[in-house]
Amino acid sequence: LEEKYIKHRYAPILPSKNEWPVVKLARERKEFVKKISDLSEKRILDLTGNNHDILKEELETTLYREKLRIKQNPWAVDPDDENEFWGEVKHSLLQVNAESGLTKANRLKQYKSVLHRITSRYAEEIASNFKHTHYKFTRSVVQFGFSRLLNAARVKGFRSIFSTQFSLQDKIQITGETDQLRDLATKGTIVMVPTHFSNLDSILIGWIISVMGLPPFIYGAGLNLFNISIFAYFMNALGAYKVDRRKKNLMYLETLKTYSKESIQYGCHSLFFPGGTRSRSGMIESKVKLGLLSTAIEAQRANYQTGTQDISAKIFVV
């Protein structure tokens, strides 16, 4: 016989919202964004060996790709000042290149200034806008909305939409090592890596996280989802930071990875879809993308090197 599913009520691990890492991070958003920009800039300078010629090449490559993206693949969610910003970057680079009397040190300084403007913009674009009041509202809407839809599917007739015969947890059964997951959340930072099935995954997994009494997770959501206003609201409310998969330049990718790494080090539980895109077959991915996932390893290594001893020191990938 099939074992009967028992609905559990889980007490919140952190009862006060003020204890949630995502709330603490949201309060320090301005300072955190600046930190991400500065660390990304330093990382890029290290990768280019502080060589002004290599840095110039990366800046020009970024400019070219961004101008091409704006022309060939614009999205509604893109900032209104995109053309203006990249036009200013182009003007600055032309100005530096035209000044033949500059020393190598001064030329590098000028390029660093342009780099700083780019990483600052990227960091601000990527950063989440978590608000606790919006999170509570979104949780209620998800629970109410999906419950009504599931009742309509299981109970015949139009009036079934308003039925409360079945709750969301009646249909979506939360099974597995739930107690172990809750225990890990009290001992360190969790990085969750589920298989991606649909655009509703983030919302439904967010609801499951809430039901299990875990504090909200942050996660990278494709910027294309923010083209739809209602999705944008829910994504922001659930702690999503933005991932623009059109941008493949070094400066954007390093800023994105730095944001993920520093968020995990801050103690924010995180969620990645390791396949990078939806699994049409429903099978667990045999090949995973290691870009953002590698930031969990980087964060753990950094914690070890700095001797961090608090709860954020240990990172668990589940």
What annotation goes with each model-predicted range?
Residues 1-318:
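Membrane-interfacial terminal anchoring regions of lipid-handling membrane enzymes
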